[in-house]
């Protein structure tokens, strides 16, 4: 009996071992399929297809930049893998890369449309935009699509704009015609309208806002869509592992406030547009900036600041006019007060080199003076506000924000609190009293815009149009200073 029991146990063990070996062999022969997310992690690389534009991805002298790049870089970091950005020449190539498996996702300022949604998965949108019909000042402004004649309208092929026009033609404008360019990008289409090679095009609202800074005559005629969302696109497969991770990523970005910070950094300074001001800026880039650029660069290197930011400050202060004088007595390119100039060791505020180096030194001191827990880019914007309104008033606004339960290290919060310094119910609570708090808000916004323009103008490899040529005007000559000519000096202090 005992022998039989032993034999039964031995047989059971043998059968179990045989079954285990058979299962192991089957698993080795036909392993479980690896998910897309697991494949990315195993590869150690996230492949992202994009396009080059001011709103997506581009190169600067400091490396890669653009909203889509920053979003993709943070997502790759979250996954613990390296980021590989693939650049497509057009929209067709972007979608082909998804279809062929060459890219894991597309981050290219893509709008969700019904037709695209049938072929690809789209994440929750990260930015709202509208589609706008664009024309140039001096050409007829249409009030409706029915006023657009044959040969007057062109858009990018395979774009959401083309999809929207087809929808509108089928619904209410059967006679509407347009051309589709398979090789152009949004900036090229806007340039063609500005250069009067094309009467009309369609652009997303944020792209028009940025490009109007380069081509001030461009205008929105009307919107052809309601609010739409920009999102990432993924191949429409049954495996949603990577897509779900990206969807959670965007949800977390929104909840943490990181997404709004990024959008503010890239688009928060585009709220207002000054047509005359941008024409003047483009003209001064050609005729004034070359005289002083080397001093901006030298001062920037000495004080660890981007020279284009210093130049943007100088333009906001004086339009790069070394003889500038305000009614309050501030003088020179960087518009230094007499007291500030004395503190900085500037003997002659009308000497452009002394003024530029003095302004750089002052801005650098403000950056260093701010509390260490203020991070970039908030730190730079607050230092700019202090440059304009004074460090004490900036700190008053930060204290008010803290008292009211807001984050005093967030520029968006301080931007909303600075104007309170002009209202008695608030400034009586501060150490430094009344200030025209709306002025530093406009001041910072303008400098951010000039800074972005200078970054784009000086971008490596960018196809540049000389400012005078871009405005349809000959660039003004730069008159040389007579050898040894003395610079005008500050008048003696009272």
Swiss-Prot record:
Subcellular locations according to the entry: Cell outer membrane
InterPro entries: Lysozyme-like_dom_sf, MltF, Solute-binding_3/MltF_N, Transglyc_AS, Transglycosylase_SLT_dom_1
Key words, A-Z: Cell outer membrane, Cell wall biogenesis/degradation, Lyase, Membrane, Signal
Biased composition (Pro residues): 474-494
Chief location: membrane
One GO location term (cellular component): cell outer membrane
Signal sequence coordinates: 1-24
Record region (Non-LT domain): 25-270
Gene3D superfamilies, per the entry: 1.10.530.10, Periplasmic binding protein-like II (3.40.190.10)
EC number: 4.2.2.n1
GO molecular function, one term: peptidoglycan lytic transglycosylase activity
Active site (record annotation): 317
Region (LT domain): 271-494
Region (Disordered), start-end ranges: 464-494
Domain of life: Bacteria
The reaction(s) this protein catalyses: Exolytic cleavage of the (1->4)-beta-glycosidic linkage between N-acetylmuramic acid (MurNAc) and N-acetylglucosamine (GlcNAc) residues in peptidoglycan, from either the reducing or the non-reducing ends of the peptidoglycan chains, with concomitant formation of a 1,6-anhydrobond in the MurNAc residue
Alphabetized NCBIfam families for the sequence: PRK10859.1
PANTHER family linked: MEMBRANE-BOUND LYTIC MUREIN TRANSGLYCOSYLASE F
Family: In the N-terminal section; belongs to the bacterial solute-binding protein 3 family.
Stated role: Murein-degrading enzyme that degrades murein glycan strands and insoluble, high-molecular weight murein sacculi, with the concomitant formation of a 1,6-anhydromuramoyl product. Lytic transglycosylases (LTs) play an integral role in the metabolism of the peptidoglycan (PG) sacculus. Their lytic action creates space within the PG sacculus to allow for its expansion as well as for the insertion of various structures such as secretion systems and flagella.
Protein name as annotated: Membrane-bound lytic murein transglycosylase F 1
Native source organism of the sequence: Alkalilimnicola ehrlichii (strain ATCC BAA-1101 / DSM 17681 / MLHE-1)
